[in-house]
Amino acid sequence: APEIWFLGQVGAVILLFNSGLESDLKLFLKYSKQATIVAIGGMALPFILGLAVMVSFGYSDNFTDTQAIFMGTVLTATSIGITVRVLNELKKLGSPDGITVLGAAVLDDVLGILLLTIVVGMTASTENLTLIDISIIIVKTLGFWLGLTIIGRLLSGHISKLFVKFHSNGSLLVLSLSLAFISSGVAEFFGLAMIIGAFSIGIALSGSELAKKIEKPMHGISAIFVPIFFVTTGMLVDLTTIASYWEFGAILTIAGIIGKVFGSGVAGLLAGFKPKDSLKIGVGMLPRGEVALIMAAIGIASGALTQNLYGAVIMMTFITTLLAPIILAYLYKTDK
């Protein structure tokens, strides 16, 4: 039903706005060098493997095909929320490898959402895109994200002071969510993925007094709308297609695991971490969670993903999200 789909989209905006709010930019800047190396490694290998799987299974003719690029983009996703919860429960959020994973996950999401927005722009075009067209989409996407983040960051103190005058946390939440929805609407107006607006304004407001004030009510509203988003993504899955295309789903899942664990893990070694800590970093970057689901939902809505490819993405997301906390807990428990 259109109403449920609309509520699901509201849930997606709230989810990404919250992810942005929870992104600690100061922490990221402290370990920015290591986090950047890990994020690049954790994006490059999954992206290449995503392209390779699509071409080898015959879903795409070449590596420049939009569907192949979209699948590669989905494989780059890392869930900040799941990674934070796991490291928090293990009391390892403040450790060097924990902070690096968190910083890399933030950068991973920023780059992944930028990449997604570029691919959506490519999909929206009915004509064959030239290099100039693609360059325009990239410049537009980067310009929008940087512009919104910088303006938001510069104004976050003023916005926070203005909003905090409303003593009711409920009023603060309504005003903050209004900003998220307006930013999403502006992104859509420019032909970009709406989630880039919500995520960017969330990052801009992260660490502010306002972010602290709306933390509790944000969890309350998330508990209402976010499950609706997960229900709508589940409703789009045709279980018969998963059963029919399980081989592709299995290979995509293996590519997703190898891409993150090896890509981020080897990058961790290059960043100066010990082998076991590098493995923890690789596994910490593994869960795809809500980020991949949002990307997949946008993919099916924009026509970049077919039903059977969507089912394979859901399978890969579910398995990687399930495996990561178990393996990470085991790796930390076996520390001397």
Tell where the protein language model's regions lie, with residue ranges:
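Transmembrane helical cores of multi-pass secondary ion antiporters/exchangers
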Residues: A1-K336
